[in-house]
Amino acid sequence: MKFLPPLLLCACFIYAGNGVAIPSDAVGIDTPAKIKHARFILELDANVAVLKNLNGEIYAGLDNGKLYKITINSAENSARNSAAGQNFADRNSAANASINSDAAQNFNAKASVNSTRDSTANSAAVNSLANSTAANSTKQNSAENSTALNSARNSVPSTISKTLIFALPSSKNYLDEPMGATIFDVDKLGEKYAFLYNGDAFEKMLGVFAGGKITHYKLPMTGIKNVYFYDENTVVLLGLGSEILYFDLSSGKVSFEQKLTIASLGGSAYDRSSGTLLISCEGGIVFYFDAKAKKLMSQKSLHKDGIYSVALLGDRMMSGSNDKERSCYYENGDFAKFYNAHFAVFAVALSPELGAFTVGNGVRVIDKAGEIVRSIELDNDIINYLLFAGEYLVGSGYNRYIYFWGLK
């Protein structure tokens, strides 16, 4: 009987959260329904550093400092705009040359961050690119908001459109040489965008784009990985050391801070409707954090290795791990299931009816019951980002391409 209390503690830990029992074994990933090619492939002008579905809209942050909104047009609009899109694409090349030159000079002239303020002011907004950002974003939008699908494969120019939201000026590396200001995370609330990017000497910075201008903030600590809007005046920052920081935009100061674990941060997801922040770590644990109450609700030990990606939608959750035997975990409120992908699962995604996770040579799509219904084959690409958009599954690696797989 002396072993009973530890066993009870273990049982409580396993069933923590929503009461779904965690299975002990994993199922295979084979399925006969295969998709061999993407329906569309969008080629961008730089590598994709982050790809997200924000309030039903697709956004891609690139390693050249540009943020694009990606739109999947209807068949009717595609047919109507095809000729116009092609003509615009023909004019785009010549226009971009002069516009990009002017934009680069204008941005660089006004993008310097004021480092002469005291330490308190350094936490607040460092600089605001009010007029230059608005003007340059407008100029570049006119040249870059094309409906051209720039891939040689499966090219349908008027089906996919991209809209430039803003473009950051170049940063400088340790040798004072110009480099792209990589945008590596982004969130949106209303018409405000919060994003993380690499500034000079690879210093990570926070930016907020609203009303045609960008306000830059010094981050309160190094190693910030993710940003989420809590409200219009507050963002939640997640650190590599599994820190949660509430950052007040008006004062530039941290209003709340909590460290979840000593393990490094893995993937994260925020269900704004429920106020639940899902955070994972290298120890294979996921944490359910109540963003409104600012307290930890529960945690689950799911994998034996680090977790790369998580997704949360209502009572459904997925996690992708480096655990070779239990690579992917899925629960739908009634039951849970592990999948053995025989490879690290770098990305997972959920829609109201489906789920998806990467495998070594492609992607698997599951229904709400956890049954694999589609198998997407890839050549040599590694997919780091997955999301659902209408009847498409959308994915990208750290390259110039965004893939659109039709699911109907």
Which ranges hold each PLM region?
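A short beta-strand motif characteristic of beta-propeller blades
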Residues: 37-42, 163-177, 212-219, 253-259, ...
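Conserved strand-to-loop turn within each blade of WD40 beta-propeller repeats
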Residues: 62-63, 199-200, 239-240, 280-283, ...
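Blade-level signature of beta-propeller repeat domains, shared across WD40, Kelch, NHL, RCC1
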Residues: 379-408
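Hydrophobic core register within WD40 beta-propeller blades
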Residues: 51, 184-186, 227, 268, ...
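A short helix->beta-strand "capping" segment at the edge of beta-propeller domains
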Residues: 19-47
